[in-house]
Amino acid sequence: MKFQSFIKFFAIILLMQGAAFSADDEHDHDHSAHSDEPFYGHVGIRLHLDHVNDAGESDEEVNELYTHSHIELGSRIAEGLNIDTNLKIEGEPGGHNHGGVSRTHDGDDRIFEDHPLIVESLTLTYSHEDFSAYIGKFNPKVGLDYHSFPGLWSYSMIEEYKIAERIGAGLKYGTNLDDFGTHQLNISAFHVDTTFLSDALLDSRGHTSKEDGGLGNTEDFDSYAISLGGKDFYSLNNNIAERVSYRFGYAHQEAGTAESDEERYSASIV
C-alpha cells in the first residue's frame, strides 16, 4: 500500500512537470519573484538507480532505486500577502539518514524504500516594495541552496550543512544597484520544528519534541541567522561578471538538551 501511494504521488509530480511548473536554468527560486501571480510553482526531480557490485560487506552489493525530489507551490492570497510551501520526498541510498529516517542494507534490493514525504517549509509572507516579512516553517538562509550546486549528487552536500525545518520569523530587504547587481539581506530567528509538521508521510519518522534535544531545539526563538547574497552583475567588458553570485552568512544555534551552542559561518562566490 505504501509503495502504491508513493507511485501515485510521484506520478502527480511528473504530471505537474509536464504542465510547465518546471523551470529552466534561469528560473528564480526566490518566490518573491512571483508574488503578484495568483498561483505559481516549481518541480525538481532527481531519480537515482545505483548498482553496487563491490562492497566491504556482501549485503551492501545491491541495486537501489530512489528519488530526492520536491514541489514548491505558492499563491497570492491578498495584496502583498503570499503563502508558500515546499514538499519534499527524501530518498537516499542505504547507510544514509537524511530526513530523519535510518536506511540500512539487508542484502535485498532497495526499490523506493524509506522515502519520507516532508513538509520542509510552509510560510506566510508579507511584501511591500523592497521589504518582506515571513513567518512559519522554513530553512534559515545561511549558505548556498540546492539550485546553486551543479552535479547529480550535489544535494547531498547541502544536506550535510544546511539548517532545515525551523519554526520562526524573518525579514528580507532587497535592493537593485543596476550594473552592480541585485542584493538581498535575510535575517531570521527560529527553533526546531516540534509541531505536527515534524513528522512525515509515506515513511513516518516520528514527532519531534523538545525532550529529543539537539541544536536549536529550545521552543524559544533564541537561534538566529543572517546572510547577504547578490547576483545579476553587469559589465560591457567582462562576461564572467554577469555569471557571478555570492553569499555570506552567519548563524547561531542555541543549545538543546545535552548540546553546546553552535556558531557557523558561510562564504561563497560562484
What do the predicted segments below correspond to?
Residues 8-17:
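Bacterial N-terminal signal peptides
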Residues 23-41, 73-83, 127-130, 176-186, ...:
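Short loop/turn motifs that connect adjacent beta-strands in outer-membrane beta-barrel proteins
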Residues 24-70, 221:
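Short glycine/proline- and aromatic-enriched beta-strand/turn motifs that initiate or cap beta-hairpins
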Residues 43-51, 85-89, 135-137, 185-191, ...:
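Transmembrane beta-barrel strands of outer-membrane/channel proteins
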Residues 52-58, 94-98, 142-147, 194-200, ...:
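Outer-membrane beta-barrel proteins
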Residues 58-63, 90-91, 163, 179, ...:
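Solvent-exposed loop/turn segments connecting transmembrane beta-strands
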Residues 62-195:
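Outer membrane beta-barrel
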Residues 219-270:
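Detector for outer-membrane/organellar transmembrane beta-barrel domains
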